């Protein structure tokens, strides 16, 4: 029986795209910072001149799937990380955005065969979002680790 796992040992050959929502950018910028820190510490060049990392900005979390799909289909990336923050309000808009973003991101991953990391915070309050984006810990770091593991695992499986 073979055990196949992704590793974090040598991530320097991975090409990563990050698709990030501008809406709630107080939160998404913090997630991006945590993500970039993790990628950098694991051998990904995050400099402005990097050929390993590209970042695409979209208006909100609802738009994450379409740009993730475009990037995944072009064959330039081993993994795509999506970053967004949807905070519950007084209307059902939250439920629609979260549902469509999550289904869309999962569909893109299945249809393209490229791991798409779901890095969208879904919280009831701004305080909860802030706690997940840096006050207590930064889930951007975790999303980057997931990306590195999945990128490595996909190479191991192929």
Swiss-Prot record:
The family database entries (SUPFAM superfamilies) matched by this protein are listed as: Lumazine synthase
CDD domains per the record?
Lumazine_synthase-I (cd09209)
The molecule here is called 6,7-dimethyl-8-ribityllumazine synthase
> Where does this protein act, in terms of pathway?
Cofactor biosynthesis; riboflavin biosynthesis; riboflavin from 2-hydroxy-3-oxobutyl phosphate and 5-amino-6-(D-ribitylamino)uracil: step 1/2
**Annotated residues for binding of 5-amino-6-(D-ribitylamino)uracil:** 23, 61-63, 85-87, 118
Cross-referenced HAMAP family, in alphabetical order?
Answer: Lumazine_synth (MF_00178)
Q: What is its EC number?
A: 2.5.1.78
Cite the GO molecular-function annotations of the record: 6,7-dimethyl-8-ribityllumazine synthase activity
Question: What Gene Ontology terms describe where this protein resides (cellular component)?
Answer: cytosol; riboflavin synthase complex
Q: Which family does it belong to?
A: Belongs to the DMRL synthase family.
Q: What does this protein do?
A: Catalyzes the formation of 6,7-dimethyl-8-ribityllumazine by condensation of 5-amino-6-(D-ribitylamino)uracil with 3,4-dihydroxy-2-butanone 4-phosphate. This is the penultimate step in the biosynthesis of riboflavin.
Q: Which UniProt keywords apply?
A: Riboflavin biosynthesis, Transferase
A biological process from GO: riboflavin biosynthetic process
List the catalytic activities from the record: (2S)-2-hydroxy-3-oxobutyl phosphate + 5-amino-6-(D-ribitylamino)uracil = 6,7-dimethyl-8-(1-D-ribityl)lumazine + phosphate + 2 H2O + H(+)
Q: Where is the active site?
A: 93 (proton donor)
Query: Where (2S)-2-hydroxy-3-oxobutyl phosphate is bound, by residue?
Result: 90-91, 132
């Amino acid at each position: 029986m073979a055990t196949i796992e992704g590793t974090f040992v040598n991530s320097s050959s991975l090409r990563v795209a990050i698709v990030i929502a501008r809406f709630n950018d107080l939160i998404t910028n913090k997630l991006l910072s945590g993500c970039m820190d993790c990628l950098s510490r694991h051998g990904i060049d995050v400099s402005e001149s990097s050929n390993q990392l590209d970042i695409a900005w979209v208006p909100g979390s609802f738009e994450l799937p379409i740009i993730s799909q475009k990037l995944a289909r072009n064959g330039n990336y081993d993994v795509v990380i999506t970053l967004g923050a949807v905070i519950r309000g007084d209307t059902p808009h939250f439920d629609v955005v979260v549902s469509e973003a999550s289904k869309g991101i999962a569909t893109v991953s299945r249809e393209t065969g490229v791991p798409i990391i779901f890095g969208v915070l879904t919280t009831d309050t701004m305080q909860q979002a802030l706690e997940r984006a840096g006050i207590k810990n930064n889930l951007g770091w975790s999303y980057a680790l997931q990306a590195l593991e999945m990128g490595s695992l996909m190479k191991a499986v192929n």
